[in-house]
């Protein structure tokens, strides 16, 4: 899977830089047809792999180019940026982010109406900031806003953050500022689709658990950290707390990723395995563990969706699913192949994920851990099962993760953390192996046994 993964990465990168030229697209289409003809004549595994890689390169490249090109079309939201006050309708996608003074909404399926004209469906998404909003706006609500559309603008600092491109990669073509009196909710619950109903249910469960933690845990900062660790909700966590974790080199523990999903998979695999072991026939045949692996996919998928399904969560989810299927098929799992499979699936669905910081950090860390352990697997300390050997492995994991993410952190955040290896010995065991398992267990049982979850 390494070659297809490299093809997807190269295609997504080229799509943002080269595919706006028609001759480049024609050249790669010609290359694709050439590989197709070779594959038809010589159907070997290697030829098929190259053919598939060229296909993935084209798909990711053209998809990436189309994402960036939408903003330049005549149907884009861009075209309404200088037309004064408009009637803007859209569907709230994702969870509304409530701050101290304003609420941030992301609108999709946008239509725009000028005074004296019919509504017009526009391409792209809108970020809407509503000031003084008291009533609750939920995911999948259809809303109308009376305001003007502004284009995203970069600061003129050389080498500064490219805010315009950042929003364009998310499909966001404009920004709207409005007061609470300018916003109206149009659509009711009985008109929601199944997908929208699921999104709303998941978001409401995250909010309900966040309120449960706030009422149970006396310290507000502790409650906010527990909420972030278990549900991925960032709006409840003070900026000061996030900065403290970042300076200590432990901000990765706050992101829902491999650690959290592995705990969920492990907890439910053990639970279902215990249940199915009660059947003598399943126990004798050995099918209890395979059925438990399949059953664990249900709560694992639910938790991945509930946490927001960020690129780091997607990577961890796909790798765990590949591992579970390898376990069921009784085949030896390959970490690098699983990582490459995750990259291929994510980039084929959304090539813009390549430019996400969470995607880069997550994949770089895991890649360095996998490659690092191939180098030290014959070291006696790494093969030692004693406490000292486990501490050595733990330190190696932290070191390889730091080495992989070090350049990315420097580039994006202008920050270097020299104490991460030290803090990893304290923070990760305390949070990762005590707080996170307890928090996740509490989340799954609090709807049924709230007193036990509070304990």
Residue ranges and their predicted role:
Residues 3, 11, 42-45, 176, ...:
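Hydrophobic alpha-helical transmembrane segments in multi-pass membrane proteins
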């Amino acid at each position: 899977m390494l070659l297809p993964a490299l093809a997807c990465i190269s295609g997504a990168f080229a799509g943002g830089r080269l595919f706006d030229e028609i001759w480049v697209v024609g050249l790669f289409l010609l290359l694709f047809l050439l590989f197709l003809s070779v594959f038809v004549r010589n159907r070997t595994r290697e030829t098929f792999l190259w053919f598939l890689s060229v296909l993935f390169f084209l798909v990711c490249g053209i998809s990436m180019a189309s994402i960036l090109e939408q903003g330049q079309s005549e149907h884009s939201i861009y075209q309404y940026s200088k037309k004064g006050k408009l009637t803007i309708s859209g569907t709230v996608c994702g969870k509304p982010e409530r701050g101290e003074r304003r609420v941030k909404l992301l609108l999709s399926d946008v239509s725009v109406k000028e005074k004296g004209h019919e509504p017009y469906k526009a391409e792209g998404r809108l970020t809407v900031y509503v000031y003084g909003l008291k009533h609750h706006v939920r995911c999948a609500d259809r809303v109308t806003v009376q305001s003007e559309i502004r284009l995203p603008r970069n600061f003129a600092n050389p080498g500064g953050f490219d805010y315009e491109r950042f929003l364009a990669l998310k499909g966001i073509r404009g920004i709207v500022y409005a007061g609470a009196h300018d916003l109206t909710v149009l659509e009711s619950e009985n008109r929601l689709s199944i997908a929208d109903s699921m999104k709303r249910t998941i978001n409401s469960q995250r909010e309900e658990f966040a309120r449960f933690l706030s009422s149970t845990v006396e310290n507000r900062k502790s409650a906010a950290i527990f909420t972030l660790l278990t549900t991925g909700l960032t709006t409840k966590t003070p900026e000061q707390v996030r900065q403290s974790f970042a300076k200590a080199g432990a901000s990765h523990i706050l992101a829902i990723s491999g650690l959290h999903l592995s705990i969920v998979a492990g907890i439910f695999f053990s639970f279902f395995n215990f249940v199915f072991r009660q059947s003598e026939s399943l126990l004798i045949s050995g099918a209890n563990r395979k059925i438990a692996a399949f059953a664990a996919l249900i709560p694992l998928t639910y938790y991945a969706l509930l946490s927001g399904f960020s690129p780091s969560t997607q990577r961890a989810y796909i790798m765990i699913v590949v591992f579970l299927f390898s376990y069921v098929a009784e085949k030896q799992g390959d970490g690098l192949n699983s990582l490459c499979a995750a990259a291929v699936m994510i980039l084929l669905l959304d090539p813009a994920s390549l430019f996400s910081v969470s995607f880069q950090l997550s994949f770089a860390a895991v890649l360095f851990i996998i490659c690092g352990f191939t180098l030290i697997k014959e070291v006696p300390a790494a093969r030692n099962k004693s406490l000292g050997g486990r501490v050595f492995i733990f330190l190696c994991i932290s070191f390889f993760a730091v080495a992989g993410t070090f350049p990315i952190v420097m580039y994006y955040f202008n920050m270097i953390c020299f104490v991460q290896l030290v803090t990893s010995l304290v923070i990760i065991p305390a949070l990762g192996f005590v707080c996170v398992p307890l928090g996740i267990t509490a989340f799954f049982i609090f709807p049924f046994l709230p007193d036990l979850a509070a304990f």
